Amino acid sequence: MDRLYHPAPSRTDCADAAVLRVRGGIVGAATQSDRVAEETPVALEYNGISHATMLASPADLEDYALGFSLTEGIVERPADVRGIEIVPQFNGIVVQVEISSACAARLKTRRRAMAGRTGCGLCGVETLPEVLRQVPTVADAAPVPLTAVLHGMRAMRGSQALHDITGATHAAAWADAEGRVQLVREDVGRHNALDKLVGALARQAIDPRSGMVLVSSRASFEMVQKCAAAGIGILAAVSAPTALAIRVAQNTNVALLGFVRNADAAIYSHPERLRLRP
């Protein structure tokens, strides 16, 4: 069977593919059309110098560039990013980011070439200190009701439009202190989805201390690290955290929750950031 792929007419982040389905062990009589997620090489350039190439969903790339710049410590504040330009290429997308001269000088001292696989986040990191880099401790804030976290996670599931179409993407959502989902970003890579969300928060001037981040994936240490770098004090994941994620959360004053499903959750760090009982 010939495999035919072409972009879906209404979206850039998914495409149509011909598929021969098997149901109950029986092969279908004819091919059907299926929607699949796009996965595109996205190269980030800072002040004209190539810095990282990741595989990502080709949507919300301005959010991604700003969020990546913040969570990776390339810039300290959104104002350090002077401009973002999306430049499509025949074999991918180049995102040209202009940053302040002070940030550019600092970046040169810690430059690394990261060739990522679906937002793996570590490919090309040259030294252990670059992996476990220091990030600020998140400031204390008023406790958020645990019921709001549970409500937010349920609400996020109904807001994953790209996942509903393709079944192939992760989501990162921002919910306020009452569990109302305000923003959702999706990507084939869970780190990319989180970076897009952080960038969207920054572009909309939303205080990261005023709510929580919910993710449809496991919680790796990089996810905790990125939240701490953005000043986000609560990270709730639908799946498990890693041991290193828990240690990073403990050290950065981040409340880390795993297995947040329906009315269940496991709280691994800083339960004082949550109001556990009505």
Swiss-Prot record:
UniProt-listed NCBIfam families: fdhD_narQ (TIGR00129)
Pfam families: FdhD-NarQ
Alphabetical keyword list: Cytoplasm, Molybdenum cofactor biosynthesis
Origin superkingdom: Bacteria
Active site: C120
Function: Required for formate dehydrogenase (FDH) activity. Acts as a sulfur carrier protein that transfers sulfur from IscS to the molybdenum cofactor prior to its insertion into FDH.
Similarity comment text for this entry: Belongs to the FdhD family.
Localization in the cell: Cytoplasm
Cystine residue pairs: none
GO cellular component: cytoplasm
One GO MF term: sulfur carrier activity
Protein name (Swiss-Prot/TrEMBL): Sulfur carrier protein FdhD
GO biological process entries: Mo-molybdopterin cofactor biosynthetic process
Name of encoding gene: fdhD
